[in-house]
Amino acid sequence: MTIMRKTHPLMKMVNHAFIDLPTPSNISGWWNFGSLLGLCLVIQIVSGLFLAMHYTPDTLTAFSSVTHICRDVNYGWLIRYMHANGASLFFICLYLHIGRGIYYGSYSYMETWNVGIILLFLVMATAFMGYVLPWGQMSFWGATVITNLLSAIPYIGADLVEWIWGGFSVDKATLNRFFAFHFILPFIIAAMAMVHLLFLHETGSNNPLGIPSDCDKIPFHPYYTTKDFLGLVILLALFFTLVLFFPDLLGDPDNYSPANPLNTPPHIKPEWYFLFAYAILRSIPNKLGGVIALVLSILILALLPHIQTASQRSLMFRPISQFLFWLLVSDVLVLTWIGGQPVEPPFIIIGQIASLTYFTIILALMPIAGIIENKMLKW
C-alpha cells in the first residue's frame, strides 16, 4: 500500500518540500530563519486582516480608528501591538537570514539569492506603507520625506511624486492607495516566498562548510521539523515578551500625536529597521546622490555573487574575511545608531565615514581578502 502523502497531488508537493526533502546533515540553527520568516509573515497577515476590519483609510478618521481598535475592540490592543512589533521581528529575522547567506556564501545560488533581494524590497515597501497608516505625526512626515526623494529623479521626478501622492501633498488619496497596497503586498510576498523555496529546492540547501553534501543527506522530517519547532518556540517567547511587556520599545512617541501638516517634528526618521539606509541617504549632501546611495545600499547584495574571488565558499575557514564580515555587521549597527541621531556634528562625519566603510568593505576589501586567502592556501 502506497503512502498517501507520496501519491496525492497536493500532499506530494508538501511532502517534497517539508517531509522527505533531502537536507544536509550538518546545517546549524542559522538555517532556522527561513521557517521563522514564514511564521512572521503568517502573524502579520492574520493580525493585519483583523486590524483591516476596524481600520478606516481616511485622513479624518484613520488616527481615531487606530485608537478605537486599542480601546474598544476585544483584544484590539494586543492585535495592534502584535502587528507593529511583528514587523520589527520580521526585519530582525530577515537581516539575520541575509547575514547567514553572506557568511556561508549562499549567494552562489543566484536565482534563490535574486528572488530573496526582490523579497527584501517588497517587505521594505510593505513596511513603509504600513507605517503611514496610523496617520500619526511620524507617519505623515515620514511619508512626505521618503516619497519626496523620488523628485530627485531627473525630468520625471516632480510628476512622479504628484502621481504617487494623488495630489499636491500627502493626503487622503495617498493614505487610501497606501492602504490598498499594504493589504495586497503580503500576499505577493507569500507567492514570491514560494518561488524562493522552489529555486532553493532545485539546488538543495547550502551548509556551514560550503561543500557539496549530496553524499550525506537526511530527511527534513523529523530532524529539522523538531529543530525548527525549537526556534519557533524561542521566537514566540521573545515576541510575546516584547508585545506584552515593552510594546512601545521600538516605536516612535511622535506617532501618538495625530498628523499635523502645519507642525514639523524636530527630527523626522523612519522605523529602526530602515535607519542604516536612511543614514547612508543623509550622509551624501546631493539629493540625487543620496537616493542612488540609498538604493545601492540594498542592491549591492545582488553584486555579491559577481565579486566573489575566494575559492572557498563559506567564511568558516577564512579568518581575514571573517574579520571583515563582523566589521561590516558593526558598521551597519553604527549606521543604524547614526540614522536615529539629529543631523549635527559629530554625527554627520561619523555617518559619512560609516557609509564609505560600508561600500568599501563589500566592493573592495572582501574581494581583496578572498585573493589573499587563495594565495595563503596556495589555491
From Swiss-Prot:
It is found in: Mitochondrion inner membrane. The keyword Ribosomal protein does not apply. One of its GO terms (molecular function) is ubiquinol-cytochrome-c reductase activity. It is a multi-pass membrane protein. GO terms for biological process: mitochondrial electron transport, ubiquinol to cytochrome c. Belongs to the cytochrome b family. Component of the ubiquinol-cytochrome c reductase complex (complex III or cytochrome b-c1 complex) that is part of the mitochondrial respiratory chain. The b-c1 complex mediates electron transfer from ubiquinol to cytochrome c. Contributes to the generation of a proton gradient across the mitochondrial membrane that is then used for ATP synthesis. Heme b b566 binds at residues 97, 196. Binds 2 heme b groups non-covalently. Heme b b562 binds at residues 83, 182. The keyword Transmembrane helix applies. Heme 1 (or BL or b562) is low-potential and absorbs at about 562 nm, and heme 2 (or BH or b566) is high-potential and absorbs at about 566 nm. A ubiquinone binds at residue 201. Its cofactor is heme b. It comes from Dipodomys deserti (Desert kangaroo rat). This is Cytochrome b. Disulfide bonds: none annotated. Pfam families: Cytochrom_B_C, Cytochrome_B. InterPro entries: Cyt_b/b6_C, Cyt_b/b6_C_sf, Cyt_b/b6_N, Cytb/b6-like_sf, Cytochrome_b, Cytochrome_b_C_euk/bac, Cytochrome_b_N_euk/bac, Di-haem_cyt_TM. The cytochrome bc1 complex contains 11 subunits: 3 respiratory subunits (MT-CYB, CYC1 and UQCRFS1), 2 core proteins (UQCRC1 and UQCRC2) and 6 low-molecular weight proteins (UQCRH/QCR6, UQCRB/QCR7, UQCRQ/QCR8, UQCR10/QCR9, UQCR11/QCR10 and a cleavage product of UQCRFS1). This cytochrome bc1 complex then forms a dimer. One of its GO terms (cellular component) is respiratory chain complex III. Coiled coil: none annotated. The chain crosses the membrane at residues 33-53, 77-98, 113-133, 178-198, 226-246, 288-308, 320-340, 347-367. Keywords: Electron transport, Heme, Iron, Membrane, Metal-binding, Mitochondrion, Mitochondrion inner membrane, Respiratory chain, Transmembrane, Transmembrane helix, Transport, Ubiquinone.
